[in-house]
UniProtKB/Swiss-Prot annotation:
Recorded GO CC terms: chloroplast thylakoid membrane; proton-transporting ATP synthase complex
Further remarks about this protein from its record: In plastids the F-type ATPase is also known as CF(1)CF(0).
Broad class of the protein's primary localization: plastid
Transmembrane residue ranges: 26-44
Source organism (scientific name): Bigelowiella natans
Family of the protein in this entry: Belongs to the ATPase B chain family.
Name the UniProt record assigns to this protein: ATP synthase subunit b, chloroplastic
Length: 177
């Protein structure tokens, strides 16, 4: 074995492995590793377990929130459908109401137009009757005036003019009223 080393013998003699020290180092290292693994392993295991539990709790909490949100979504969808149904009902009832109201208003307008036409016809007939009455009154009045003048001139020629004039005037006034 000495041939393998390129060192001379004096160095080899001075360099020796102390196996007692090596055994002690191995024992110390195993104790340290045991203590480290024992205490740090437990702490690491506890930390990992806590982290695992935190993650599980977060997932469960998230699942609960998802469940709540899904329930709220279903509730909102049902309310939306109910609201849409109500809106459609209100729309159809309002449409029906306005259609009926329109028909009623058209009938009222037609009635008013009929009344206006009747009133116009009555007004024209009334005005026609008034004009005819005025023409009749004027004609009768002029006729009586002419008759009075003719009678007056005829009675002037005769002797009893003043008594006959009073009788004719009285008769004329009576007919006018």
């Amino acid at each position: 074995m000495n041939d393998l080393f390129l060192f001379n013998n004096s160095f080899q003699d001075s360099f020796e492995i102390n196996t007692d020290l090596f055994d002690t180092n191995i024992i110390n290292l195993s104790i340290v590793l045991f203590v480290v693994i024992r205490f740090l392993g437990e702490a690491l295991s506890d930390t990992l377990e806590n982290r695992k539990q935190t993650i599980i709790d977060s997932l469960q909490n998230s699942n609960k929130k998802v469940y709540i949100v899904k329930n709220k979504l279903v509730e909102v969808k049902s309310k939306l459908e109910l609201t849409q149904t109500e809106v459609e009902n209100v729309y159809s009832s309002r449409f029906s109401y306005f259609k009926t109201r329109k028909q009623t208003l058209l009938e009222q307008v037609q009635s008013y137009l009929t009344q206006l036409q009747s009133l116009q016809k009555d007004s024209i007939e009334g005005q026609t009757k008034k004009v005819l009455s005025d023409v009749y009154d004027t004609t009768i009045s002029k006729t009586f005036d002419t008759l009075y003048i003719n009678l007056a001139s005829a009675f002037k020629k005769s002797g009893n003019f003043s008594n006959k004039k009073k009788a004719i005037t009285y008769s004329y006034l009576k007919r006018l009223n």
